[in-house]
């Protein structure tokens, strides 16, 4: 593991299961995916696997929450992906402020690019790790692609997402609405590709595991359960403890059982952990992280999804699972008939949702695609016109 603030090589390549003919073709273009969390890896993995199978050389630069035991040491999941190189970088210590994490990540990724120069750097979303990689790629004149730009939310992270859009040379967005927002930021329509949300590719395919296997692996004792996730809102960190106490208090009062996926490491997380640690174990099963296929199977069979994760407003509607979005974290992110809304302190609304929606199933909502993002991503990268696009961008005025 590299020391904080300086990159040192720590790579592994596993090509045992990649077909020989694809490996011979893979000397053409090199792609580097940057991942800092379990969430963005769930979106990048199907894209990376499809690119590997199409003959591209694929590598991951792994940092952030992936490197921390408290959050499940999810770098292990990246290492499980065959046929790719994996490079690790420790970019933070517990309690580091976001600006320090950003600075350390810039230093580490800059050192990495001095030794490796991929043909394309791919980042996702709005995390500081993605922002650092986008900035370093831009200042080193390395082509970069931003996945799921043009989204809106209720947190300061939305600013980071829009920064990534301006730094990237190519954009792979989840919807026509997102494309319109990216164009409103002056980006060329020819560099924006609507592919849908990549994680739906996984949810649209068989998970490969049964619910019984998932429950056994993660020691989940109930077959009637909801999934609860409550992340910090960085601009509301002073109130996160009170919000978490009210939210989980309402869940506890319902008499239902819940699988609780632990929060990310944004500022305010410690107060949420303190609330979760006090929940009764006979009603709440706390899990730091899950393999994506196992989580997909768990969610398909859940009675409801509650909390402030994007899972509730994007993936749950696609699977037809009722969801309750709590607070401001996903404000204006998405709407669907199966998604309901409440403030963390609105116990009566939370109770009403659990009473009326628990166990219901809704028609699939395809506002973020049909589960074919990886195919569309590869099709764009196979077009030589993609690689001929100049790195120098021009601001495109609307109308």
Walk through the language-model features, giving the residues of each.
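Donor-nucleotide binding loops and adjacent catalytic segments primarily
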Residues: 67, 74-79, 209-301
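A donor-sugar binding/catalytic signature common to diverse glycosyltransferases
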Residues: 123-124, 131-134, 171, 291-335
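C-terminal amphipathic helix plus adjacent low-complexity
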Residues: 357-399
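Conserved nucleotide-sugar phosphate-binding/catalytic loop shared by glycosyltransferases and other
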Residues: 56-101
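Active-site and donor-binding regions of nucleotide-sugar-utilizing enzymes
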Residues: 30-35, 40-54, 89-189
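A nucleotide-sugar donor-handling region in carbohydrate enzymes
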Residues: 34, 67-70, 168-242
